[in-house]
Every structure is written in structure tokens, then in C-alpha cells.
Amino acid sequence: MGSGRVRVRFAPSPTGIFHVGGARSALFNWLVARRAGGDFVLRVEDTDASRNRPEWTDGIISALDWLGISPGGYEGPVLQSSRADRHRAAAERLHAEGLAYYCDCTREALAERTGNAQRGYDGFCRDRGLAPGPGRALRFRTPDDGVTIVEDLIRGTPEFPNETIEDFVVARADGSAVFLLANVVDDLEMGITHVIRGEEHLSNTPKQQLLWAALGADAPPVWAHVPVIVNEKRQKLSKRRDKVALESYRDEGYLPAAMKNYLMLLGWAPPGEDEIVPWETIESTFDLADVKPSPAFFDEKKLKAFNGEYIRRLSVAEFIEAVRPWLSAPAAPWEPAAFDADAFAALAPLAQSRVSVLSEIVPMVDFLFLPEAPIDDAAWAKAMKGPAAELLADVHDLYDKIEWEAETLKAGLTEVGERHGLKLGKAQAPVRVAVTGRSVGLPLFESLEALGRETTLRRLAEARERLTGG
């Protein structure tokens, strides 16, 4: 992986949400640095002032921290905008050495000459000797012949004939460097040895490799372009169409360990048949050479299943701690004083075995802490038929007398159901809806035990009154 100390960088732009693709690239970079005993640099490419916002930079740092890439464990964040003078100096050097020239061609003028402004620049200003001035961008003088060969750990050695690479812009008319140049200057001066990034940047690589050479680098960095991430229709993930914001998964209750494990599978696989593996195993076995170049399918259903498995592997105490943010405002719809930690703890193991994301805990246990059962109208209409009113009355009378314990409550309802010609499954339906508000949920009798006799009896009576009109 090259000689000397390995230095990688993760260079996101603070122009919106933190994409799951960016999270994967960050993890790949982090692991390469960790395995090599090298350095991870966070460089925030904030040169697009019209689109950047400080809160998005904060969001990047927070998201990385959630993934285990914590401040203090890396260099940065370095704001690319703080290095604007270095970028300008590099542009001036390219011009002074005859490796770049000024151009005043507009898109319209190019279209007139070529018939198509999308065909690329035709080199019209190459030998005009223009000086810097308003409306004049600086273009790199691409070699007329030869081939630029990119050695990529994932994609082999793609070749780019130089004649197909247009004289590309490296600095705008105001002197500010464009992404291509700023990126190379920063990588070169920061001593970056490995550039690990998304496949969409591969087309930029021959241009950047030419700039590395022009700016005096002995060799380009080690390139590694990780595969594009696609949805179920094999379309590239889009923030306009797909659920791609890492923050949305975090806020929904995905565990960072599950997310990290799943993201690592987007182009790579751990040894053996198991995909759910300890992070220590991933950290000790990950190698860029094993990353596949083919598109990686982001399967939300699989991620959710992963998360559910990670939740089930927690201890009950860890699970209770993990769901704590959802058991209080603003996530919880009940008053803070209504929360009963003992009642929740009694049902926590049952809930843990059923949730796939932590936020699912709220509708699973809200009946415990709300003053009234959160009745689902469709569930009510389906369950409260036939002898429901009489059954609820009989259950109420029996439950007022017997021991308040799940098995006893079950036996009691079984007995009442038989009197009404109902098997236990049918007899449970109106009781469940009356007490919990829903037709499905945690095991009924454990739920009743946790809810308590007084509240259960009150809700059974209220449900019967609603059915009978008084």
C-alpha cells in the first residue's frame, strides 16, 4: 500500500444531508488508516459558499462521531476555504510555468465554433497568450498525446488517452480554484497517500493525476474508487428519491454498530459465511484489494433485519438504555410523570425480541403510560363484534377477583371465552383492543400484568360502555 506513513482523507462537502455513501467512504478510509497505523484527515470542502452551511459541517462531525470516528481520533476538521491562498498560488505557478493559460471563451462562443457546447473545450485560447482579467478562466494545458494510466486498487489500470481529455478549468475568473485543483493541492500538501472515494470521481482522476505531476509530485496517490450504491431498481441512490440521509436512520433508531456492519458490506464481504460479524473482525480483515467494483445494492429491508438482530444481541439493560431517548419527550406522546420504569422493564425483554428499529418501541408500549388506550378505529371495528360487550363484562368481573399474574389472567380469559363459545385467540381480540388500543402488540397477559389491575379494569369497563352506549 505504498511506502511511508499512510495518510487518508475524507473530504465531504457541507451542502446538505450526510449521505450513506459518504458514510461508507468514511469507514473505508478510517479502516485503511487504522490497519496501517496511519492518519485519517477530515477535510471539509466548503469552497461553494452559496451552498455551504455551518450546521451541515456540524452534521458531518456528529454523524462521524455516531459511527465511531470521533473528534480527537483524527486530524481536522480542516476547512478547504481556509487554504484558498495555497490554491491561488498553485494556479499562478501553473500559469507561470506555461502549464496553464487564460481563456475568455464563453459557452455560447464554444457552441458557435463546435456546434455543441457539450463536446468539450476545443483549445481555442491555447496560444493567444491572454493575461489574467475579467471573464478569463485559467485552463490546464493537457498533453496532446500519450496516455494517462490510473492505477486503481479496485478497478485495475484504466487508460485515458490524453487527446480525449479537454483543457480543463483549474481557476475561475476571480482567481479562485475549482474543485479539481483545490483537491489536488490539498492532498499533495497534506501528504495524502491514498485517495479512497466514490466511483463517480473516476472520470476526474486522469485530470487530477496530470495536476499531481504538474505540481511536482513524484507519484500520484494510491487510488481506490469504491462502487456506486444503487437502489432496488439498480438506479444510483438519490437524495431526492431514496432514503439516503444517515441522520434519518439514526433518528429512527438504527444502532451504529448495525449501520457500520451493513455499510461495510456495500462492496466488500468479511471472510466466512456470516455477514453479521464483530467490528473487530471487520477491522482486522478489511482490505481495499477485496472490494468489488460492481454496483452495491442498498437494501433497506436487509439493513432493518440487521438492525433487529443487533438489537436482540444487546443485554436487556443495554436495550433499555438504547431506547431511553424514545421513552421521553419529544418522541414519547405521554407525560413524563406517567412513565413507569418498572412497568417498562417488565416488558422490555418482550419488546426487545420484536422491534427492528428502536423507534418502534413507542407504539408498542404507549398503552402503559397514556391515560387512555390509544384506540385504533379499524382494530376496534374488527374486534368489537358479536358477544364482545358481554365478554368484556365477564372478563372485568373475573379479573376483579383473581390473582394479578400473567398465567392466571390467561387461564381466566380462557375460561370466560369457553363460556361464550370462543377459543382463546378469538376471546383475546376485544380485550386486547379495549386495553391496548391495537389488535397486535406485545403478549397480552404480560402486558396486562405490567399495566396493573386498576387501569385494566377501568379500560375494560369503558370499552363495554362504549359498546352498549352506557
UniProtKB/Swiss-Prot annotation:
Enzyme Commission number(s) of this protein: 6.1.1.17
GO cellular component: cytosol
EC class (word): ligase
SUPFAM superfamilies for this protein: An anticodon-binding domain of class I aminoacyl-tRNA synthetases, Nucleotidylyl transferase
Catalytic activities: tRNA(Glu) + L-glutamate + ATP = L-glutamyl-tRNA(Glu) + AMP + diphosphate
Gene3D superfamilies: 1.10.10.350, Glutamate-tRNA synthetase, class I, anticodon-binding domain 1, HUPs
PANTHER family: GLUTAMATE--TRNA LIGASE, GLUTAMATE--TRNA LIGASE, MITOCHONDRIAL-RELATED
Name of the protein this chain belongs to: Glutamate--tRNA ligase
Organism: Frankia casuarinae (strain DSM 45818 / CECT 9043 / HFP020203 / CcI3)
Lineage, uppermost ranks: Bacteria, Bacillati, Actinomycetota, Actinomycetes, Frankiales
Gene name in the database record: gltX
